[in-house]
């Protein structure tokens, strides 16, 4: 089979930088899927993405679909011919549909008799006839939330399309995609290299684009170049560049031919908290800040230009000029805010609604203050400090700095609290109350901060559920899913002795008569336990393990986690499958019992050796495992219970549970009931698959 390399490039106006990488990888994945669906073999699909183009290059693409043999079965021979041996109308209709006569059909013998059959070989189409459709479909399936039209065209895409290049080897694949006819014209950099040039072979891409058009089409190549040069520039300045992956991807998406440069700002701005300076450098300007070896911000930054003049001084000066007003604003806001104590902002919180039915931010801080104090008492934190941090928790939202630079909430509260002479634990808690801010983020370090973070999250969860506004579908305006998962992470990873039901009930009381949902405790707890499911699935823990623990509805997160870890370990044991099946069998047997099942095992009613053996082991384990259950040592307990496999198997092999004698039957049911209850102290093992 012959193969060729295939190139498809879509030349556009500037694509959304935050979406570029996602669009490019999705384009490649879609092309791969379409090729597979068409039955076209290939070696590899490479993707390229720059601000004004999306491209894929398919290596080793078969130049034609493989031929395939098809078999069309017709009517049974007995129904295909009449008594005189002439073809019936059914046979003739089938044959006509196949493009043959009845006489040309083959016959096959089956266990149900003899049938007419037509076998044919369908030749595969040339690949070049399929490529326009494949690329069109791949583009149509891109994850584009909002499309646009341009000119007088009816076609829609994320941005206007100007060129389409489709080359199978050196052959131009003619066709129209998104209203643009394919050709061999490729556009280069807006300001460097050739604006337009011709490409004659798929193999010339992307090298020719870099050589003639001054465009580095390979996203990962540009990204690596920016990273290396930024680190090199920072090192030369005696520091380390702060290069976050998301910002690096965004900057990579903004330039076609990256030119990495370093610039500076006045040292006086370093008197402003670094977080505010970094916020504007990263968020507004897409710059990379530089820190010294001790983690202190240096008065330098890295930026990436899309042009490469011999003398970059003008570009550097321009960027320094652009960032100066933003830093001046931050300096002004900071100095203005310092004229008031953080506590002086409390009255202003009364002017800002948290939620119409739940009151103002001042109401919320009062609740957080009380709840943080209660939590602090339970986890051994300083109650006074926790309450103080709770009281001040939202004051920085009223400051000029946070109003202008919203992402500095919390961290500016910390800086202002320090300036006011607040206790260090209180100040740090004002920042850490929002942790974890996203999946994988760090947790509050101190117990005081943990108390405030939990109080804030439980206040929001309880309040919003308490007025019947639980998240529906993907809508979650109060970020309740994130709040629930964050609270669970804090409790579990810090092994805090807290109960969800108690926390929600305590929180609910602080709302007075504002809540209208009488089931708020159960609903919030169920919601949070549901977030456990997502958390553990992300960790790769089997769904049946999570279901087994959820069936017991433990409401202490640290305890829930211990059970999940124990059951996950138990599931790997050789005896797990048999004991899970046995528990399922026990559940089915006991479910059919009418009336109450006794929990007392009468030794005088033990007849068979196998039931005696099981009963004795169950009775012994009941005494031995109680201390383990009380201490939450579930894995050790399940390891001990795993040793029951043989006696359980023997019991079911040799003992008739539903004996005719009612006393024997009830006693055997009691044995099984006690056996099941031992496992249920941890989880419902019968749910393991």
Swiss-Prot record:
Enzyme class at the top of the EC tree: ligase
GO MF term set: arginine-tRNA ligase activity; ATP binding; glycine-tRNA ligase activity
Reactions catalysed, as given in the entry: tRNA(Gly) + glycine + ATP = glycyl-tRNA(Gly) + AMP + diphosphate
EC id: 6.1.1.14
Coiled-coil positions: none
Entry's Gene Ontology cellular component terms: cytosol
Keywords linked to the UniProt accession: Aminoacyl-tRNA synthetase, ATP-binding, Cytoplasm, Ligase, Nucleotide-binding, Protein biosynthesis
GO biological process annotation, one example: arginyl-tRNA aminoacylation
Predominant localisation class: cytoplasm
Source domain of life: Bacteria
Entry-linked SUPFAM superfamilies: HD-domain/PDEase-like
Subcellular locations according to the entry: Cytoplasm
Pfam families named among the record's database cross-references: DALR_1, tRNA_synt_2f
UniProt cross-references to PANTHER family, sorted A to Z: GLYCINE--TRNA LIGASE, CHLOROPLASTIC_MITOCHONDRIAL 2, GLYCYL-TRNA SYNTHETASE
Subunit organization: Tetramer of two alpha and two beta subunits.
UniProt record similarity statement: Belongs to the class-II aminoacyl-tRNA synthetase family.
Name assigned to this protein: Glycine--tRNA ligase beta subunit
Gene name for this UniProt entry: glyS
